[in-house]
């Protein structure tokens, strides 16, 4: 009777031991190595899983950062602090990534670009596009039905009373969801500090563009002529700014006859001032000034800036090695 119990138990025990050894061997043979830095990087990421980095989520981004196929500042949500934390884990330098925010490159409000028809349907820009490109008179303009607002996971977008989306730069993480969702391609990411922006996406010729919107770019080229830094070109009948070259001197804003380039000339513009006690009269500022607004003699400080001629481009500020120049806003709100 006792043998009838012990024999099956012994057999089961032997089989259990054999299977256990087999599983242990299989675990070693088929083990998938995970770099110990992956969970550390994952913990440093914000965990939004928004896909703004171009990957399915934060887990995938962490693995790609450690694997070397993604930059340490690839997360648009975490910003500089997240990049610094990841850089510390990876033993690298974070660098200085420029924060970007979503911007609407359209000024076609209900008044400046009226509708050509009434739209009855789902309040979604993508669905409205099916009906002959939407109800807007300008076929390139914002429809204003709030698809960008609906897809924003951070509540950074609201639809204003004028029918155009308004982006809160404090909430925007530059994840790019709104850019992907906009059927008119008028949502774009620009550097947060960039105020001078062409707010038009109309590719029609000037006369036609003017008929559909009173603030449309007419490709007149006035901005191109005004820019001293070759930062503006006209492509497909619409002005385009190279933000890497733009000095935000507001000359293009002042010259645009259609007011389609954003920027507050009165309050946004700055003027350069010499800090006399720091000036060593090296002449770098005068040499690089594009309008010859700075005069003086080498080794005879201080140099003098003609504030009426200064366009506020800030080149002298960047070139000065002695912190002898500061940029002061012309007006403060």
UniProtKB/Swiss-Prot annotation:
[4Fe-4S] cluster 2 binds at residues 138, 142, 148, 182. Residues 126-162, 163-192, 207-237, 239-266, 270-299, 301-330 form the 4Fe-4S ferredoxin-type domain. GO terms for molecular function: 4 iron, 4 sulfur cluster binding; electron transfer activity; metal ion binding. It is an enzyme of class 7 (translocase). Binds 7 [4Fe-4S] clusters. PANTHER family: ION-TRANSLOCATING OXIDOREDUCTASE COMPLEX SUBUNIT B. Residues 33-92 form the 4Fe-4S domain. It comes from the Bacteria. [4Fe-4S] cluster 3 binds at residues 152, 172, 175, 178. [4Fe-4S] cluster 6 binds at residues 279, 282, 285, 289. Gene3D superfamilies: 3.30.70.20, Electron transport complex subunit B, putative Fe-S cluster (1.10.15.40). This is Na(+)-translocating ferredoxin:NAD(+) oxidoreductase complex subunit B. [4Fe-4S] cluster 4 binds at residues 217, 220, 223, 227. Its cofactor is [4Fe-4S] cluster.
